[in-house]
Amino acid sequence: MQRQRANDTVTTFRYNTRSSSRHGISNTLRVVESKTSASSPRVRRWRKKVSDDRRSTNSDLLPMDLIKEILKRLPAKTLARFLCVSKLWSSIIRSRDLMKLFLTESSARPGRLFFTFRRKDDCFLFSSEESSVATYLFTIPASGYTNNCSFVHGLICYGTTAYASQLVVYNSSTRRSITLPEIEARSFVLKHLLGYDPIDGVYKVLCMTVPRLVLQKKKKLRNNVTDAGELILAPISLPDPPYYVIYYDPQRQSTRKVVIRGITEHNCKLLRCKKRHPCILYYVFSSQVESLMFM
């Protein structure tokens, strides 16, 4: 056995084991803890190695501008998964600079159409790219005053109560939603508009209370405006397949008809449209811009 060094410390503790007592083994364990000076050559070499490793790691990192340039090109669903990578990634994705870059980048992508059909006490939301099969998103309960729904950058704001005092904002890209604080509006129907403030880079909801409106006669077409300024015209009633949407460009004075497949063929059982409770188109939206809200 080697001789114990002078700068070592001997620590003893006892333990109980049946096997050691049977064979006459002492119940004392000697542990040698080496005390190494902080100024010893071995410690100095270890510290130098760690410092060199940190320098090499920092030099291997990509510039922040290049990281944001890569992230802005990814889909919103992919960025939502990247939030769990680290706190650094989460702060980068949630930063205001990346959100503005992402909005600008997504505006160049192909647009999507959103349809909200109502049957009796339910509203059904569908989304579809131009000339593609519609995809069912979710169902929300409809009240007697479900006549207001606002939309911007893929975010849909709608009310869940009779007077729309409880508002929900739904992100169609990440399929996540948040419920806004309830607003007291008992004797008036609440009107709300969802908008985007490009200066501060935030989304805002404008709420107004107006007297109850008398329900007007059902119109034949629903309309809205795309990000490019085209007017959207969609039939209010669910016709025989295929379902179609008309685009009108006021600058070029041109009209184009787009067929949307899948709303009646694949979702007729879901809507359960009958003559007594026909399906009615309540809203139609168009969006080319995605949002990173609720990330």
Swiss-Prot record:
PROSITE patterns: FBOX. Residues 56-102 form the F-box domain. InterPro entries: F-box-assoc_interact_dom, F-box-like_dom_sf, F-box_dom. Transmembrane segments: none annotated. This is Putative F-box protein At5g44220. It comes from Arabidopsis thaliana.
